[in-house]
Regions:
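Accessory, non-ATPase domains that flank or precede helicase/AAA+ motor cores in DNA-metabolism machines
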Residues: 1-360, 367, 372-388, 420, ...
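Small-residue-enriched segments and motifs
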Residues: 3-8, 20, 48, 393, ...
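A short, contiguous, amphipathic alpha-helix enriched in charged residues
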Residues: 5, 17, 651-666
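Generic solvent-exposed, charged/amphipathic alpha-helical segments
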Residues: 86-89, 499, 503, 583, ...
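Inter-lobe coupling/hinge segments of SF2-like helicase ATPases
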Residues: 198-204, 208-212, 220-654, 658, ...
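Short beta-strand elements
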Residues: 512, 668-684, 725-733
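Nucleotide-binding motor/catalytic cores of P-loop/tubulin-like NTPases across gene-expression machines
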Residues: 671, 689-693, 718
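Short beta-strand/turn "edge" motifs
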Residues: 680-691, 737
Length: 739
């Protein structure tokens, strides 16, 4: 039999596999797809994933290098996840090596063993008693023994200090055979016979009907869109479905859009379940992430909660996938492997033959279209849980009204009345910083970023101008860089300015700012929300971080300071995003006994979109928007791919895209492909960003299959084009941002 040739995927942008000979002493029978091998690659070493073992190679046998080492006895990637990665690589036209690497925790990419660490666990020894005379006069030992007795499954060595357990006391107890030490693998917890740690909440008729419909599809793949108004109890539906999944001996994967939602989601699940819960997102360290990943793979985590990358967490016994806030743009990866976690979760659920639930108060138009056409089951929750009422909307026309740091007089009055009534107020302004720009009142100079076609935002607290696009920062100048005068004025309002002004207007009440700047410290978000949950009258000022899934029962007024930004945009999705944001922010009001009110400041109070959204609701808006998309031939009635390019010199990116466009036109004619339109190339909406000039070419197709047939052949040509070496380019399949 000829020597085995290993075909490996390496973490490289090159869309090809690499052939190697087997490592010395490794037999063909030991090799299986999904295993990791360390291989030489140029002057360095890399970790590759075995895709197949074959007898043939286009490279002469004497030119093939041997792999250096086989790192696994069994593939760390289960076959089902390996299959998902193959599909992902093909659909998103991305390197298989990069895709497989992305699916692995960082430590596995670096060659660490795919095994959970062994840890020492301390527990009370069989037959030990608090009445043992040997500890009668040893209060610290008695206290340590009593603490251990409260943890019948043992306490991990690393948690001793957290429980105030003295190692010296434990060593003395060990010498007396009153405690024991067991070395075993670390896991998130131990399985319980009774899943519920607290009783479930009673369901209303709509919630009950939704649970029953989803439960009827538990034995195979079914997709459901749970479209429930804010505060309708979608989370309670999730929890009861998960309990039924656990009772069937299976695992549940729950995706959330933001890291900041992780702690409160975890707390809610821990309060409800006696279950082993793994948290997977970029905020946990590499070791914790590996442990959670392995626990899920080996069936030792019952519930996996995480952001978009948690989609690639393996499950030994998959039973249910839930995508919360499925409309959220955070589920789309914008760099490297540009996958959409929601769309890929549907593929995974189909491959695993399990149900998937997409939940949102403001479903994406794509998901609504799939529900209306029967691809998903549509489940509506139209009433708020617990008898809470929907908030009332008021459009406040601020034309010709004076604005004090962006806040009108009637808005100030409404805020004051709410605080005086002992309630909380949420002030929404989707703009960080003190002011969007700095203006010279003498010559008209404005603070622009030297690396981007964008204004520098004033951050007064730190005395800085910052670009929110490339991160460039500089001190606020004392004199105008253009004319030398000193009359420099912040123009417009951001959350920092609103916070400052509200503190002056309402000095007797706390003003809490919730944005990326104020929550950058570890646990800052938890501390802010702990203050809010005390229920004392206060003002929350924040960006869209406040709109995502948070429960503020004492908020009865939501003040939206500027609703006009999304009404005029070159991006066809802008109105959808604006509608979702307004409804989600409004949904924070009146979630308990007190009714809520939403006041929207606008210069366009008669705009048809605002009227429809505030008077008829999100679904009326969505149906109108779908009709407009159908007429314009836009998603979900068409399929898009976006080729982006950027270069240091003007014109280089567009020159590359011009050549790429010509190649695409030639392929269309050669393969007789129809229904595909090439739009561009054109400069990007922000042409210069981080010192690079950017351009893009949009492909719009009536059907998905011809588009992907074109993309596969086209990319091979793009990789060989000499002009492509002078630019940085990427292909985005199903783009959500045309930036």
């Amino acid at each position: 039999m000829p020597d085995a040739i290993l075909r490996l995927a390496l973490p490289s942008p090159l869309r090809r596999l690499f052939d190697y000979r087997a490592p010395a002493g490794v037999l063909r029978a030991q090799l299986h797809p999904g295993m990791r091998l360390r291989v030489p690659f140029g002057r360095r070493e890399m970790i590759g994933i075995l895709v197949e073992v074959t007898d043939h190679s286009e490279v002469p046998a004497d030119k093939l290098k041997p792999a250096l080492a086989l790192l696994d006895a069994t593939p760390p990637l289960p076959a089902s996840l390996f299959k998902l990665c193959l599909w992902t690589s093909q659909y998103y036209q991305h390197s298989l090596g990069d895709t497989l690497s992305w699916a692995l925790p960082v430590l596995l990419r670096q060659g660490e063993p795919a095994e959970a660490r062994q840890e020492r666990f301390w527990s009370v020894a069989p037959g030990a008693s608090m009445d043992d005379p040997r500890i009668a006069r040893a209060p610290r030992q008695r206290e340590a023994l009593a603490t251990l007795a409260q943890h019948p499954h043992g306490v991990a060595h690393q948690l001793l200090s957290k429980l105030m357990l003295s190692k010296d006391s434990l060593d003395l107890l060990l010498a007396k055979d009153l405690v024991q030490v067991e070395v075993r693998r670390h896991a998130p917890g131990l399985r319980h016979e009774h899943w519920l740690a607290q009783p479930e909440l009673p369901l209303n008729a709509e919630q009950r009907a939704a649970c029953e419909a989803i439960r009827a599809g538990f034995d195979s793949y079914h997709a459901f869109l749970l479209a429930g108004v804010t505060g309708s109890g979608k989370t309670e539906v999730y929890l009861q479905l998960i309990r039924q999944t656990l009772e069937a001996g299976k695992q549940a994967l729950v995706l959330i859009p933001e890291i900041n939602l992780g702690p409160q989601t975890l707390a809610r699940f821990e309060q409800r379940f006696n279950a082993r819960i793994a948290l997977v997102h970029s905020g946990v360290n590499d070791r914790e992430r590996l442990e959670a990943w392995l626990a899920a793979r080996d069936g030792e985590a019952d519930i996996i909660i995480g952001t978009r990358s948690a989609l690639f967490t393996p499950m030994k016994n998959p039973g249910l996938i839930i995508i919360d806030e499925e409309h959220d743009g955070s589920y789309k990866q914008q760099e490297g492997l540009r996958y959409h976690a929601r769309d890929l979760a549907l593929v995974r659920a189909r491959q695993e033959n399990i149900p998937i639930v997409l939940g949102s108060a403001t479903p994406s138009l794509e998901s609504l279209h799939n529900a209306y056409t029967g691809r998903y089951g549509l489940l509506r929750l139209n009433e708020r849980a617990g008898g809470a009422k929907q908030p009332r909307f008021l459009r406040l026309d601020v034309k010709s009204r004076p604005l004090d740091s962006g806040i009108s007089g009637p808005m100030q009055q409404a805020i004051g009345q709410t605080l005086a009534a002992g309630q909380q107020v949420l002030v929404f302004l989707n703009r960080r910083g003190f002011a969007p720009t700095l203006l010279c009142h003498d010559c008209g100079w404005m603070s622009g970023c030297e690396r981007c076609d964008a204004r520098m935002t004033v951050h007064q607290r730190h005395g800085e101008l910052r670009c929110h696009h490339c991160g460039h920062a500089e001190r606020v100048p004392r004199h105008c860089p253009q004319c030398g005068k000193v009359d420099l004025r912040p123009v417009g309002a951001g959350t920092e300015r609103a916070e400052e002004r509200l503190g002056i207007l309402f000095p007797d009440y706390p003003v809490l700012r919730v944005d990326r700047d104020s929550t950058s410290r570890k646990d800052a978000m938890n501390q802010l929300f702990a203050t809010i949950q005390k229920g004392q009258p206060c003002i929350l000022v924040g960006t869209q971080m406040l709109a995502k899934g948070h429960h503020f029962p004492r908020v009865t007024l939501v003040s939206i300071l500027d609703a006009d930004g999304g009404l005029f945009s070159g991006d066809f999705r802008a109105s959808e995003r604006m509608a979702q944001l307004i409804v989600q922010v409004a949904g924070r009001a009146g979630r308990a006994e007190e009714p809520g009110k939403v006041i929207i400041q606008t210069h366009l109070a008669d705009h048809p979109l605002l009227i429809q959204l505030t008077e008829q609701g999100y679904f009326a808006f969505a149906e109108q928007a779908l009709s407009e998309r159908r007429g314009a031939g836009l998603p979900p009635f068409a399929h898009l791919a976006l080729l982006r390019a950027e270069a240091h010199k003007p014109g280089q990116a567009e020159a590359f895209l011009d050549e790429a466009c010509s190649e695409a036109e030639r392929l269309l004619a050669q393969q007789n492909l129809t229904g595909i339109e090439l739009l561009g190339p054109v400069p990007a909406p922000m042409e210069r960003r981080a010192g690079r000039y950017r351009a893009q070419l949009l492909l719009q197709a009536n059907a998905r299959a011809p588009l992907h047939r074109l993309l596969s052949a086209w990319l091979l040509l793009l990789e060989q084009m000499p002009s492509g070496r002078a630019v940085r380019w990427s292909l985005d399949v199903d783009p959500v941002d045309l930036y």
